[in-house]
């Protein structure tokens, strides 16, 4: 499978063809877990160090027949009920005054491009933060955003759900780059450690750690 088909299966509980985002093999929309839980008043978050229209994060908010339909996928943020989305910027948000940014703000969805700016957004306001990794500053967005994610989503009264993706393990696998695979895996491992620590303190949190597919055959002779 690929990230689109696997991401859709994880987000919806229904298998589909490769390259599908939130649709079945015939192109019909499938309700995702973000939509199902939001309808019950549960706070929802989608976090990734990939671009915001990457196959895995988009499977939790979009419904498109092809993973490369980046503009259409980004526009599905206008109708997604997700309370918090953090991922790297993409072409649809190339300018701060892009049409999509204006449309989101017209729907009272805040849009920011740096993680610290989230502190300026009311906890009850939906927000999209276009923040990627900054290796020059040793900034890993999935690690650095965790406490903020928990603070914002736990403000609701009916619990929360969040999907957090460490996407770059896969990117290292595609390139058969063992250093990147290990480095990104260690970053993800630190994130899981933070999540487990929170779950130990909270007592009512379920954590699932999953991979959607293997890339690069790192376990074989490609290293």
Language model regions located:
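A post-motif C-terminal structural segment
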Residues: 1-7, 54-220
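Active-site nucleophile/metal-coordination loop of metallo-enzymes that catalyze phosphate/sulfate
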Residues: 1-68, 82
